């Protein structure tokens, strides 16, 4: 098995943490796993023997994309991987096409979400075509949630028999043992800012598609009712799909908002939240939702692809209609006024995450999938 190479692809090195622990787990199982991405510090953490740099741009750039495709074809021709597992949209497209052209036996497209869900017109057509080509070139598809699998099928992107969901879903699961409830100490400056208020939390990219406008509007409703609350937002403000200026000013200037651009370890921040609001418009799965639940924080999310897989409505959190900030505010108020409900939902969420979304489950299922392919190749 050692001589059969397995290539994992992502577009940019910043996406390598999506596979945190997975590469190491598979290599310990004597699998010759390599990583391909654009250059970056995350890729440099791996030995040159298994780390391959192929420059790729996240946005559509025809000339640059063709150059990336050619370099990928040359890499596959030289290294001859038996399995190519391509994740993230651009690497998914370039990787599956290159693997198809070079006739790599197993071509997996790991779908972590569909950007086309929140766009219209010509851009929708382009993104749909990209997904259609990638899924056609793939021999197998991994969807990171059951609802994402359903969306792929109903969008006529691929047939059901081509799609697998590992375990109960998620991008990579979570390493549950790291999510300790007693890890709640914040730097003094953050502790003073939160000041023992009821904390409404959010972790993720600060873009329209994540429902930031609804997060802000629901928070305004709660404040208008006289509750002593703080909004803790952890994430980076991005230029693509950027939020409205009024929302930007609210996040950066309102004294009841604590905005933190980036933290390497959000666990202590989760442990200082009373409720986690995840009003996303689309997801592949939504790992931040299960991270919050792992630390007994009730989650309020929306009824969209990916997010609905993370919460059992009324048991580990609440699911509301996409865009309905009044419903979000209603659920927040319910949780503010019922400490017993918060505790019950929190306990239920942690138990469910431990039982269903451990990284070990995802890794073992992926290992089993690879072993099946490798054993089939030995019999030929």
From Swiss-Prot:
Its EC number is 2.4.-.-. Gene3D superfamilies: Glycogen Phosphorylase B (3.40.50.2000). GO terms for molecular function: glycosyltransferase activity. Keywords: Capsule biogenesis/degradation, Exopolysaccharide synthesis, Glycosyltransferase, Transferase. It comes from the Bacteria. One of its GO terms (biological process) is capsule polysaccharide biosynthetic process. InterPro entries: Glyco_trans_1, Glyco_trans_4-like_N. Belongs to the glycosyltransferase group 1 family. Glycosyltransferase 4 subfamily. Required for the biosynthesis of type 1 capsular polysaccharide. This is Capsular polysaccharide biosynthesis glycosyltransferase CapM. It comes from Staphylococcus aureus. The lineage of its organism: Bacteria, Bacillati, Bacillota, Bacilli, Bacillales.
């Amino acid at each position: 098995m050692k001589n059969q190479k397995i290539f994992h692809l992502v577009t940019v090195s910043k996406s390598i943490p999506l596979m945190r622990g997975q590469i190491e787990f598979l290599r310990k199982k004597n699998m010759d796993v390599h990583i391909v991405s654009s250059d970056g510090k995350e890729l440099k953490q791996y030995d040159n023997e298994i780390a391959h740099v192929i420059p790729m741009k996240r946005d559509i750039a025809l000339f640059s994309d063709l150059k990336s495709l050619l370099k990928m074809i040359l890499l596959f021709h030289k290294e001859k991987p038996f399995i190519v597992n391509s994740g993230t949209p651009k690497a998914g497209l370039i990787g599956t096409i290159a693997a198809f052209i070079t006739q790599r036996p197993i071509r997996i497209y790991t779908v972590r979400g569909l950007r086309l869900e929140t766009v219209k017109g010509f851009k929708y057509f382009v993104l749909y075509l990209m997904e259609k080509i990638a899924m056609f070139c793939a021999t197998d598809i991994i969807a990171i949630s059951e609802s994402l699998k359903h969306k792929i099928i109903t969008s006529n992107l691929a047939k059901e028999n081509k799609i697998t969901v590992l375990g109960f879903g998620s991008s990579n699961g979570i390493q549950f043992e790291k999510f300790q409830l007693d890890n709640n100490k914040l730097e003094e400056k953050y502790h003073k800012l939160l000041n023992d208020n009821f904390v409404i939390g959010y972790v993720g990219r600060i873009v329209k598609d994540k429902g930031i406008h609804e997060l802000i509007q629901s928070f305004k409703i709660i404040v208008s009712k006289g509750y002593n609350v703080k909004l803790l937002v952890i994430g980076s403000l991005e230029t693509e799909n950027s939020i409205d200026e009024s929302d930007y000013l609210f996040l950066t200037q309102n004294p009841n908002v604590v905005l933190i651009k980036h933290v390497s370890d959000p666990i202590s921040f989760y442990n200082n939240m009373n409720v986690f609001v995840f009003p996303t418009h689309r997801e592949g799965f939504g790992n931040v939702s299960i991270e919050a639940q792992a630390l007994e924080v009730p989650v309020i999310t929306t009824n969209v692809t990916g997010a609905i897989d993370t919460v059992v409505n009324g048991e580990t959190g609440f699911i509301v209609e996409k865009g309905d900030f009044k419903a979000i505010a209603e659920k927040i108020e319910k949780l503010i006024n019922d400490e017993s409900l918060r505790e019950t939902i929190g306990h239920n969420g942690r138990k469910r995450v431990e039982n269903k979304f451990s990284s070990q489950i995802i890794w073992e299922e992926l290992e089993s999938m690879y072993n099946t392919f490798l054993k089939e190749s030995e019999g030929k």
